[in-house]
Each structure stands twice: as C-alpha cells, then as structure tokens.
Design a protein with these regions (language model features):
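Acidic, small-residue rich beta-repeat scaffolds with periodic aromatic anchors
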Residues: 6-31, 127-227
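Short consensus segments that form the blades of beta-propeller domains
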Residues: 51-55, 82-89, 128-131
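Beta-propeller blade termini
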Residues: 58-67, 113-124
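Sec-dependent signal peptide cleavage junction
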Residues: 1-5
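Acidic/hydrophobic-patterned starts of short beta strands in beta-sheet-rich repeat architectures
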Residues: 67-80, 121-127
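Blade-edge motifs of beta-propeller repeat domains
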Residues: 6-56, 101-115
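Structural motif
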Residues: 84-95, 133-140
Length: 227
C-alpha cells in the first residue's frame, strides 16, 4: 500500500508549486501575504487592488507548462481573459516560477506597465517601459538552470530632439551599451504590436478552484508525448 501511495504521490515540483499557488489564493482571499513570494507579486497585487475578491479568484489563473524544454514544467500565474467551453484562456502572465536545484525559483513577472507573454516557440516577450521616451521589447528564453537567456532587446531612448531605437543582445536597456538602429519609432511600435498579436493563449485553471482541484484538470500539456 505504501508503494502504491508513493507512486500516486504528486511530483516534488508539483507539491512545491502548490505552496506558491496556495499563497496567492490566501492573499487574494483575505490579504494574507506572509507566504507570498517576494518576487513575482507585482501583477498579483495590482489585481487585488482593482478587482473584487470574487472577480480576482475567477480571473486569476494558474497552470503548469514546460517552457524551458527540460521535461519539468514551470508554474505560470496569469490573467484569464476569456472562457471557451470548459476552458479558461489568457495571454497575460503575471508570474513564472521554475523548479531547479530542488527548489522553486522565480523567473519573471508581468504587470500593467510591463506585459509578459509567451510565444509559440516558448520564448518570453516583455513589452514595457517607464514612459513615452523609454519603451522596451525584450525577447528571452528560459534555460534549464532557471536563468533567462537573452535573445534580443529593443528600446527607445532620447537622442538630440527625438527618439532613437536601440538594439542590445545582452538585455541591458542602456544606450551606451547598445547599437543604434535605423528603425523608426513607428516601426518599433509595429514590431511590439506584432509580437503581442502572435503571442499564444495559455489555458489556465481559475484560482477559485485551487482548493478543491489543485493541478487536477490540467491536460498535462507539460508532459512529453511519450510520458
């Protein structure tokens, strides 16, 4: 019987991810933030500030999806924008956590001024900025060790009497560490919009169902075809 119980037990990463989701549930439900991770809470706090408890529990979602390609899924928490049939879907991601070195590690977060979305090739795209003169588009990929590898970063920066678009392969949004492009601001904004349009929908489970459902009900999309 013990062997059977062990076989049916959830993987360690799933047990640890459940603690994170439970902390988010507690925070949305009654404001308890004692167990809420320090990193990855910005967007979640925004939701609690502008939405009612009931709406937040319905619109915040969670799922497991392997976006690093190492066979172990990441935990994604995001915003459910629509329901189709029995599924709940959304593009916006508020927090991503991975499981590496036998523990949960923070990866990235999104919020109202810094949109975080997933592409079909599992790249992560961040579109944000600190104002009209400094807008950013970052394309990154999660490595198996839990770190983010930077593919490219574009950003605007004041130059002379206007704005210039820069490109940096190290994801540092500083003009002196980047290469000036001949891209116009309009072209840059079009590129940002194109990434947003091409980002993928994520199927989430509503946070309101976590206590009774946990991770059951996921299509186990994070498992390989042979798993």
């Amino acid at each position: 019987p013990k062997t059977e119980a062990a076989a049916k037990a959830a993987p360690v990463y799933e047990q640890e991810y459940a603690k994170v989701v439970d902390s988010v549930y507690e925070f949305i439900s009654d404001g308890t933030s004692d167990n809420l991770p320090e990193q990855g809470r910005t967007g979640i706090c925004e939701v609690r500030n502008f939405a009612s408890r009931e709406a937040a529990l319905q619109q915040l979602g969670y799922t497991l999806q392997d976006i690093s390609g190492d066979g172990v899924p990441e935990l994604l928490i995001g915003w459910i924008s629509q329901k189709r049939g029995v599924g709940h879907y959304g593009k916006e991601i508020y927090a991503i956590y991975t499981f590496a070195d036998d523990r949960v590690k923070y990866v990235a977060e999104g919020w109202s001024r810094s949109s975080l979305q997933l592409m079909a090739n599992d790249n992560l795209v961040t579109r944000g900025g600190t104002g009209i003169s400094h807008q950013v588009l970052a394309v990154e990929h999660l490595q198996p060790d839990g770190s983010l590898g930077c593919y490219e970063l574009y950003f605007t920066w004041p130059k002379d009497d206007g704005l210039c678009v820069y490109r940096n392969m190290n994801c540092r949004s500083e003009a002196d560490a980047a290469q000036e492009t001949d891209m116009t601001v309009e072209e840059f904004n079009e590129m940002r919009s194109e990434y947003a349009n091409n980002s993928v929908e994520i199927e989430y489970l509503p946070l309101k169902d976590f206590k009774k459902q946990g991770f059951k009900g996921l299509m186990r999309q994070y498992l390989s075809a042979g798993g």
